[in-house]
A protein has these predicted regions:
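Extended alpha-helical scaffolds used as interaction platforms
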Residues: 4, 15-17, 32-34, 49-51, ...
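Conserved SAM-binding site of S-adenosyl-L-methionine-dependent methyltransferases, i.e.
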Residues: 4-6, 11, 21-23, 28, ...
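Intrinsic low-complexity, repeat-rich intrinsically disordered segments enriched
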Residues: 20, 37, 54, 71, ...
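Small/polar residue-rich beta-strand/coil "junction" motifs that cap repeat-based extracellular fibers
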Residues: 140, 144-216, 221-223
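Short, polar/charged loop or turn motifs at beta-strand boundaries
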Residues: 206-211, 260-266
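Acidic, glycine-rich loop-and-strand cores that form catalytic or ligand-binding grooves
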Residues: 216-262
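Glycine-rich, acidic and aromatic/proline-enriched surface loops and short helix-turn segments
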Residues: 222-225, 273-286
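C-terminal intramolecular chaperone/auto-processing assembly modules
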Residues: 250-253, 259, 287-352
Length: 352
């Protein structure tokens, strides 16, 4: 193509096809450029492959990059070992390394983030400096910018949240509201299960006992069991769960989501988390059965399995009282028997 490999001096084993492809290359070797302005600025970078107009256009010293699609990895300068497949994928990457983007606009705004994997249109779209994130599904981890070590699988999974870390969202429209969370499914899900019960770490070798006592019956008496319905629409508004038109407004290129969840109105039984929290605080009990909000957009939850501990304590306290009453009753029966013997003896003496 016109002006392809125009500046090459000692670079070898390069292939350039398209106007001004590999235009600035001087000593870079083993590069392949196909498309106008592909690898245009490359000077000493090696083992790069660019396919598509302006793909890897501004790469100068980056190595081992693969870009397939219009403007894919266009802004890369010194980033290494990146793979971009899809128009505008990894478009803004400059120095980020070891990223993989597959899908239109995937990892679009990544600049310095490393070790990210995005699969699906607009996946990890807003990421700039976040590291070690994995997104699979259209618009998954869409809003993340600086968060690290996150995983999102499913269309719109982990859509909101720009700086959360170490969180995992599995399933369509699954919402993450804080760091260090794992969420399975959206709030239309009615059943999550498996063959066996969930296992929680409980190894005495890794526990340090605390002097704090677990309250039993005093805590249980403060709890108020209720029946209720969950207002899913109100929860979605609070969490800002995206609808198709919301995403459409963010980007004219975003596909419209036409899915409308079919919420099942189910009467449920349980407690109000705020009331449980209040009851625990009144007793000075640091109860980890309450999952309190971590920020202004997070919400309350309850870990019902943790209620077993104060319930066991309550049963033990009641059993202790019962045993005490049994002992007292035994003493009373013994005294009564002794009195009956004395009365019988007195009656016998009186008859004589």
């Amino acid at each position: 193509g016109i002006a392809s490999l125009y500046s090459n001096t000692t670079g070898t084993h390069n292939t350039a096809s398209g106007t001004s492809s590999l235009y600035s290359n001087t000593t870079g070797i083993q590069n392949t450029a196909s498309g106008a302005f592909s690898l245009f600025s490359n000077t000493i970078g090696y083992d790069n492959t660019a396919s598509g107009t302006s793909s890897l256009r501004f790469n100068t010293e980056g190595n081992n990059n693969t870009a397939s699609g219009v403007s894919s990895l266009q802004s890369n300068t010194t980033g290494n070992n990146n793979t971009a497949s899809g128009a505008h994928s990894l478009y803004s990457n400059t120095t980020g390394n070891d990223n993989t983007a597959s899908g239109f606009y995937s990892l679009r705004f990544n600049t310095e983030g490393n070790n990210n994997t995005a699969s699906g249109t607009h996946s990890l779209y807003s990421n700039s400096t976040g590291n070690n994130n994995t997104a699979s599904g259209a618009s998954s981890l869409y809003s993340n910018t600086t968060g690290n070590n996150n995983t999102a699988i499913g269309h719109y999974a982990f859509f909101s949240g720009d700086s959360f870390s170490n969180s995992t969202a599995l399933g369509y429209n699954t919402v993450i509201s804080a760091s260090n969370q794992v969420r399975l499914g959206n709030n239309a899900v009615t059943s999550i299960g498996g063959q066996v019960s969930w296992t929680t770490l409980s190894d005495a070798r890794f526990k340090t006992e605390n002097a704090a006592k677990v309250p039993g019956i005093d805590f249980i008496k403060k709890l108020r069991p209720v029946t209720y319905y969950v207002n899913h629409e109100a929860m979605n508004r609070y969490l800002e769960v995206p609808k198709g038109e919301d995403v459409q407004n963010r980007s004219s290129l975003e596909a419209k989501n036409t899915y409308k969840p079919n919420y099942t109105k189910t009467l449920e039984s349980g407690f109000m988390a705020q009331e449980v929290e209040k009851a625990a605080k009144e007793l000075g009990y640091e109860f980890n059965g309450v999952d309190a909000p971590k920020n202004e957009k997070d919400y309350y939850g309850l870990r019902y399995g943790q209620f077993v501990i104060p319930l066991v304590k309550a049963v033990q306290e009641l059993n202790e009282k019962l045993e005490q009453k049994d002992a007292e009753n035994a003493q009373l029966r013994a005294k009564l028997l002794e009195l009956e013997k004395r009365i019988a003896k007195l009656e016998k003496n009186a008859s004589n």
